[in-house]
Amino acid sequence: FNGLTASVGNHNATETKNKQFEMFRFLNMMNFWIFGWGALGIIFCSGDLVELCFGSEYVMDIRIPLVMAANFYTVGMMNAVWTYKHTLGLFRYGRFLQIGTGILNIAFSVLLGQRLGIFGILLATIFARGLTNLWYDPYVIMKHGFSLSPWTYLKRYLWNLVILMIAGGICGFLFQFIGGTALVRSIVKIILCSLIANGTF
């Protein structure tokens, strides 16, 4: 997505706000497709791949893949937002936000890490991001970039989450019936996860 920055900047310079927003929605949908698919893979396939490569003793509790997938997804879904924030010249909004995110991340990591271990440290990143740029940067580009209500973005974001959870529910239901070796499980789950994600999204 970083490679698209120049093209998006040129598009913004030559097109109307409506056309700009249409392109933003398209890129946001591509974000959801790619990172939603990847998040499902992390949740449902990573354990079998770890077992295959390193042994079952290195497979972590399902909470770890879940929170890793959540981190992966939330960062990925910000790609289009950050691209448009840069190309629309909205730098001055939230210029100190990254500092706040870092401070919150450290504070939450210490607090949650002591109580929940590595799960708490990974969870801290989501909390820190959720309190800062996860909502603020979309607000900036919707309000100051496209002159639209931020609710437009939020509704689509929540709808994408619903679709992702439905796909995850289907995967979780089907995968409980898959047996065999770690190699067989990995191959079958990767194929099914890809089919379900691409079919649902």
Give short role names for the model-derived ranges:
Residues 1-2, 44, 63-113, 118-144, ...:
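Short runs within selected transmembrane alpha-helices of multi-pass transporters and secretion channels
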Residues 10, 51-52, 87, 113-114, ...:
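Transmembrane helix-loop junction
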Residues 1-28, 82-87:
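Helix-loop junctions and terminal segments of transmembrane helices
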Residues 28, 58-61, 81-90, 147-154:
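Short juxtamembrane and helix-loop transition motifs at transmembrane-helix boundaries
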Residues 7, 15-22, 140-158:
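Interhelical loop/hinge segments that connect adjacent transmembrane helices in multipass membrane
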Residues 21-75, 106-114, 164-169, 173:
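Alpha-helical transmembrane segments of multi-pass membrane transport and lipid-handling proteins
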Residues 101-104, 115, 154-201:
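Transmembrane alpha-helical segments of multi-pass transport proteins
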